């Protein structure tokens, strides 16, 4: 009898350990995986996918720098991938374990931030653009496809208190630099000062620096213009329609150009379950699974096998699938070195304190 009890106890302990091991910890952007996709992965792997969220690259990097750990897969933007590689925080990928790797479009591979894709594979892409209340801006005769709607006091006077911008120094400076005719990655100190002056002149007209709740604020009609990610604006438009709002939400890429964000799948060096991490990455490389992210959330996709499954009405949206001319005006942000980051943070702190 005692032997049987010991055997049962041992089996129960083993089962508990197996259950604990079958959890995948994903550090991801807010609302950045379709719910149906998540549930299907859990069913397929017999595991639980546990997510922790961040709303910006600065927040994600700060959490990791502060010692946050236990993540298996992270979805960082290209400049964060570059920084994480430099810090030695990522596992090198064994591509022989990824049967669906060939689905990735060549145009999104072998980028400067990770030559040869040794550590990362593209997950989705977004642009940073202008989301807006079309009904209100049409009444005022304001062109949303121009960064002046964010930075020109003459335009902002008409919509004072109805504008939010991203609480992210590199994103906001990138937009300001594009408006001034420079590269979003320009690090010339004089050009940064010009961008700071532009931001300070516009700041009194803004309602807030906001990277987390502008979808809701646009959907409710509390704000009329938001600087943010294309996938978020797609969601805001869909939410406003679903709620039967008396106004229409839309989004536009400014003609001066904008920031392109390529988000990537990486395995953190502290992963306790790399086998499950590989299964998740390969699952998301499947064309049908990748297409759900675009169809439900409104991202662009780097997955060629996903294209046949994407809704036709989404493929025609220039902000999500820009043509060659528009693509030429889009720039992925590059990682800053420590000196540049200190200089930008100083300018950013001055902006926040005024």
Curated annotation (Swiss-Prot):
Domain of life, source organism: Bacteria
Q: Which UniProt keywords apply?
A: Periplasm, Signal, Transport
Q: Where in the cell is it found?
A: Periplasm
The UniProt transmembrane annotation reads none
Provide a GO CC annotation, any one.
periplasmic space
**Signal peptide feature range:** 1-20
Single GO biological process annotation from the record = polyamine transport
Among the GO molecular function terms of this UniProt record, one is: polyamine binding
User: Function, please?
Assistant: Binds putrescine and cadaverine.
Q: What's this protein's family per the entry?
A: Belongs to the bacterial solute-binding protein 1 family.
Instruction: Identify the PANTHER family for this entry.
Output: SPERMIDINE/PUTRESCINE-BINDING PERIPLASMIC PROTEIN (PTHR30222), SPERMIDINE_PUTRESCINE-BINDING PERIPLASMIC PROTEIN (PTHR30222:SF17)
Q: What is this protein called?
A: Putrescine/cadaverine-binding protein
Taxonomic lineage: Bacteria, Pseudomonadati, Pseudomonadota, Gammaproteobacteria, Pseudomonadales
* Protein encoded by which gene: potD
